[in-house]
């Protein structure tokens, strides 16, 4: 596991994907007096499909799922729902639909294309809405059938 992604492991994976999620959640909960919504972003890759060299990423994103399972029980009595959205390959600057990873994941896309950021945002918007008041502890996979 000592690979060229050493910088990623040391400066991004743990500080952003784990510590960042924990600290941001802790601070948000301090301000939620009358209930609220916590929505974390995981990754469908860590839920159902693993790739070579993705062990650290998988570890850090998978930590969110375990964290949320405990939060559901801790925060439910306070009227706070906790859910995770697990996007699949999404066309972003970091992972463009015409980038090098697309050749690997493209054939596995059931709908034949990468997701759009607005499609992931619509799932998050639903979870933030009053209509999702009974949804908590959910892992919602929005990956175009990538992990189907």
Language model: regions and residue ranges:
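Short C-terminal tail/terminal secondary-structure segment
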Residues: 48, 125, 136-148
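Short, flexible catalytic-loop segment of classical short-chain dehydrogenase/reductase
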Residues: 47, 82, 86-97
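Alpha-helical segment proximal to the catalytic Tyr-Lys
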Residues: 30-31, 73-74, 133
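Active-site loop-to-helix junction immediately N-terminal to the catalytic Tyr of the SDR YXXXK motif
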Residues: 49-58, 70
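Active-site helix of classical SDR
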Residues: 25, 60, 68
């Amino acid at each position: 596991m000592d690979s060229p992604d050493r910088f990623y492991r040391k400066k991004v994976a743990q500080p952003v994907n784990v510590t960042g999620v924990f600290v941001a959640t802790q601070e948000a909960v301090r301000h939620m007096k009358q209930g609220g919504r916590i929505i974390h972003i995981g990754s469908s890759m860590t839920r159902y499909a693993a790739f070579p060299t993705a062990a650290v990423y998988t570890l850090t994103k998978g930590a969110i799922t375990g964290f949320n399972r405990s939060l559901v029980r801790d925060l439910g009595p306070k009227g706070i729902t906790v859910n995770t959205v697990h996007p699949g390959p999404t066309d972003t600057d970091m992972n463009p639909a015409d980038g090098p990873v697309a050749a690997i994941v493209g054939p596995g896309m059931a709908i034949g294309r990468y997701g759009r950021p607005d499609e992931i945002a619509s799932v998050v918007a639903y979870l933030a809405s009053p209509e999702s008041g009974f949804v908590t502890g959910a892992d919602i996979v929005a990956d175009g059938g990538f992990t189907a």
